């Protein structure tokens, strides 16, 4: 007579084997098993897996996919107790988030009365992906089509924030920005065009601007800054916004 012992099999059927990972994000999954009674020692082995994938002694798989490791990866995990052995076939799709490669400046200056017509551009490291543009928020009448065309006609001066999203169906990226509708400042002072020979020329500059908020900070008031674009060498604008020119070294005539 003899005794025949039937060794229990290792059941891995409860594991989900089609998974998704994202480039540059840690991917972790646990291997579950059923065995009655369970053997004291279980060994896990990766077969044909990516070089930088690891599995520890309790069946935890970890992987940090690189940008060069996009799309589908198929590999196997062997689970054995030295007698029974079961293979689990895995398929992981590595997704790279889409990239908005061309977009307006974070603060886009739009002259009053003009129309915003900007073509956003994108790319995705994955092959055969369909990207979707979406306008998450924005001013009234702003539109964003599926070709990345961002359009708006606005007349209200100041900041108009908006947010767009680009999605590949798995991951998405967002872009927050603002359109600043601007009207140019207007001089309210009248220039002095004649000065007696040898005397000091002074012209008090003043101007107004219908934009009351700074284009660069929506929490700061607007500021008018005067600068001299052209003039005689000794002409300058002082700290009190006075255009000053010492004329004693200049002969009579017209100066621009």
Model-found features: residue ranges?
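Proline-centered linker/hinge motifs at extracellular inter-domain junctions
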Residues: 8-12, 50-53, 98-100, 105, ...
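Extracellular acidic loop/turn motifs
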Residues: 33-43, 123-132, 208-225
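C-terminal edge beta-strand
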Residues: 1-7, 86-95, 172-181
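A short beta-strand segment in extracellular, disulfide-stabilized domains
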Residues: 26-33, 115-122, 200-207
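Exposed beta-strand face motif in extracellular beta-rich ectodomains
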Residues: 71-75, 158-162, 253-256
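Strand-loop-strand motifs at the edges of beta-sheets in extracellular beta-sandwich domains
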Residues: 51-66, 140-154, 233-248
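Short beta-strand segments of immunoglobulin-like
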Residues: 16-21, 105-110, 190-195
């Amino acid at each position: 007579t003899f005794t025949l012992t039937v060794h229990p099999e290792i059941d891995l059927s409860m594991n989900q084997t089609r998974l998704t990972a994202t480039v540059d994000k840690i991917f972790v999954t646990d291997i579950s098993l059923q065995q009655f009674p369970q053997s004291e020692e279980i060994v896990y082995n990766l077969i044909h897996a990516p070089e930088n994938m690891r599995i520890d002694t309790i069946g935890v798989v970890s992987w940090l996919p690189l940008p060069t490791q996009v799309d589908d990866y198929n590999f196997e995990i062997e689970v054995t107790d030295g007698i029974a052995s079961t293979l689990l076939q895995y398929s992981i799709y590595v997704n790279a988030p889409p990239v908005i490669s061309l977009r307006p400046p974070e603060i886009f200056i739009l002259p009053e009365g003009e129309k915003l017509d900007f073509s956003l551009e994108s790319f995705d490291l994955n092959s055969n992906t369909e990207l979707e543009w979406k306008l998450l928020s924005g001013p009234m009448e702003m539109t964003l089509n599926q070709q990345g065309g961002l359009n708006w006609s606005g007349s209200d001066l100041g900041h108009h924030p908006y947010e767009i999203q680009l999605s590949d169906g798995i991951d998405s990226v967002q872009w927050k920005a603002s359109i600043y509708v601007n009207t140019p400042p207007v001089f309210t002072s009248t220039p002095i065009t004649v000065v007696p020979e040898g005397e000091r020329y002074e012209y008090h500059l003043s101007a107004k601007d219908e934009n009351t908020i700074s284009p660069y900070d929506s929490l700061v008031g607007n500021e008018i800054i005067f600068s001299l674009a052209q003039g005689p060498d000794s002409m300058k604008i002082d700290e009190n916004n006075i255009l000053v020119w010492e004329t004693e070294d200049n002969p009579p005539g017209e100066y621009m």
